[in-house]
Amino acid sequence: MAGFYDIISPSNQHRPPVWLLRQVGRYMPQYQELKTNRPLKELFLDTESIIEATLLGPSLLGVDAAIVFTDILSILEGFAIEYRFAPGPEIIYSPHQPFVFTEDPFSTFSFLIEAIQKLTKRLTVPLIAFAASPFTLASYLIEGGASKDCSKTIAFLYQYPDKFEALLNEIIKGTAIYLQLQVQAGASAVQLFESSSLRLPPSLFSKYVVSPNAKLIRLIKQRENPPVSLFCRCFYQEFLSLYATGADTLHPDYHVELSEIYRQLGDPGSIQGNFDPALLLLPQDLLIAHLETYLAPLKQQSHYIFNLGHGILPQTPLENVQAVVKCLTSISTS
């Protein structure tokens, strides 16, 4: 079974493979044109829009992988949970209401399955399916959308630990089915996003991040056994505990120094990340100088995948992103 790095890495290229978090988005004029006068949710649920947007990554940037154009909330279609973008995500949900995944996921997600089937026929690079990790999706549900402090979630898991555990378990089961469908349709690999984890105290990290992600990854791999990359917002000590999840590739955010990982661990396995997306706002000459400094200790490391420490910011110049990818695809490790 090929690992995440092996699937993403271009053949006969002695350089780090590259793709980017939120590589298709508001910073692209072509994407803005696609979404003109259309609700964002409509784009995520429309087969042809998914196809058109997904293709923008490889066609405009020249990255080594495409990632399915959808949202971490799209899975809520399978739980019959009402949500919208206004413009940010808003979820209509009470953590005390029933939360069970659909018995007919093929019908519920037919729009997505069809998009992936068509994309795999058109793409010349691998296609990555993705979903939120359990704690992150649970926090979105309890907070009613994105939250910087996850205060409602933290209070809920302390007050109702059994209910929170039950919610995580339903998320794990539903997410595994959701991702298996996409792999069966033709996706080559899976990316998980644990974006809310930075808010958890270290004493709860293992219980609510490591253990649930380990369960989810085991379930995802039961059928097609796709390689899985895990993005997680955390600090160094918490990052080390992520090896217990069984993820093929670990992707820390910019709070973790990759050079420190290699210095401490020697051979840490497949690592992805974690260039600060804020640097993409710099004048291009300064951006490339920072990029070259960042890459110096990394580009000769085996199984290293270049990516960002978080998603591309909406105000990022497209030409800066293109310059970063061009720099990556032209370097030599010899």
Curated annotation (Swiss-Prot):
Q: Which GO terms describe its cellular component?
A: cytosol
Instruction: State which pathway it belongs to.
Output: Porphyrin-containing compound metabolism; protoporphyrin-IX biosynthesis; coproporphyrinogen-III from 5-aminolevulinate: step 4/4
Per UniProt, substrate binds at R22, Q23, V24, G25, R26, D71, Y140, S195, H310
Q: Does the keyword Transmembrane apply?
A: no
What EC number(s) has UniProt assigned to this enzyme? 4.1.1.37
Q: What class of enzyme is it?
A: lyase
- Tell me the subunit arrangement: Homodimer.
Instruction: State the name under which the record lists this protein.
Output: Uroporphyrinogen decarboxylase
